[in-house]
């Protein structure tokens, strides 16, 4: 029997399959649950199963942007009588503002008929006693038609799609549903998960004194909590003894009760009383029972077909026989069960979030099995390379029965099976399994202590790069570990070697994601909005194959397109190969971040960067707000004297000959 907290059994002829293959099998079997209708507040955290359209425009009436006075714009400045007040609801209903009259309006209030502009209160002056019934106001400025009025439907047009199938519902989505008047929502339900532990040695956590050979059941409590964190309904099946008939009865009852997933803990190794796998083979189909991973090798995945009843058609129940060792159990839950829950719940991208980080200390890898090493990761101003980034600290001794190694762990480091020591500062991939600690609190002091002497310059005192660059490799092959990333390192090399030409640019983040729109979109948004990168280069996924979706993901993120950059890259690439015309790259700006899709070919990356270099530095400056023109014959703005003939005169002046040139003014804003 493989008990909790005990070393599991080994042996057997079943071959271990790689983690990636095991996940592929699980995803192939796991099918999205049929949608259900729930109330508005029950929809929180679930995935939308229908498009939501706005039944009404928003705003449904012309509304004031500010507190002020609704006027006829052509009236201009002057004194006017205030004929009504429009605050909310039916205020001002039936009253028409005619030339020579005004109406008081509050922010969000409806604009009375006849008015075509609003003058804010700051640009008006009340005449006489404001308490009198006949009020007059002086309009101090000339306004234009439409000023400070939100037209009908300016936020949301009638029948516009406000939410689409596949979106996960958060607080803002609840607000949009309420805006659209939706009180019942079609969503994909969270799966119902049944949990049981097996083993004669197990007792409830409430047991006061342990008998000889007994241990408290930690796995079941841990799994119940983990499943509840995923917002699933839990069915607690308790502890089942090492008795085949008792275990079979509990499994049959669970399957017939309508659960979607069964999690067992223990009983999946090679002991003579490990009955979980034989029963799963008897009642369904076992897809695998050993995975090439550490910890978690004795993991069983099966599919059970429930018998149809009068109240329920036969359904498929997924079963995971998790290892009995606590750490192995929780690691397998995070690697396999969490993505399965998300898949059943309708997530478009159920895969766990991965990040690149640097090791804070040396770690020896296993020579045979890829390891999911428990670690605590945090963001630091200096990750050891002189730039900000995530760093990882091991939780200590990684024995699979030692639950303390999971304490405070928020990530699983993905260590390759080389048997080598990964030195401190090595870059590795990590799977996020819980909240990441915020930015480090140990900030650099801005002032030195009196009398202190700076003897040497340390890494964390080096000023940051002028422009932060992130490189995203988009590839199913590289993401799955089935091939090396050749484009990413080449792009890093090209950027770093061109740092001076780019105004001090430096690559501070890299990542690899599969060809999936949501995964690409999520990291582009994070790098733009959270990490505030100046330049993001994506590599690959720009061709014609069905999995080439990088442009689609990028277009969902960018706010302003930059077609000129794509034109230049296309021209350069066509000099090399006619197949360059098959590129569907996108480029654009999000906030203060420039995002450019590049080909996945390493040589093409270098060619495209070379083509963009003459203008890229200036582009990055402009995005940051620098409006100075860089035409080689253009007189600098600081030297311009005349305020007119902005470009033409300035340009001609630059070409004039003779001892004295006519000074040309410039007011360029491009």
Swiss-Prot record:
Substrate binds at residues 542-543, 573, 600, 607. Transmembrane segments: none annotated. Changing residue 573 to A: Loss of molybdopterin binding. Loss of activity. Its EC number is 2.10.1.1, 2.7.7.75. Pathway: Cofactor biosynthesis; molybdopterin biosynthesis. It catalyses: adenylyl-molybdopterin + molybdate = Mo-molybdopterin + AMP + H(+); molybdopterin + ATP + H(+) = adenylyl-molybdopterin + diphosphate. Residues 624-643 are annotated as: Disordered. It is an enzyme of class 2 (transferase). NCBIfam families: Glp_gephyrin, molyb_syn. This is Molybdopterin biosynthesis protein CNX1. It comes from Arabidopsis thaliana (Mouse-ear cress).
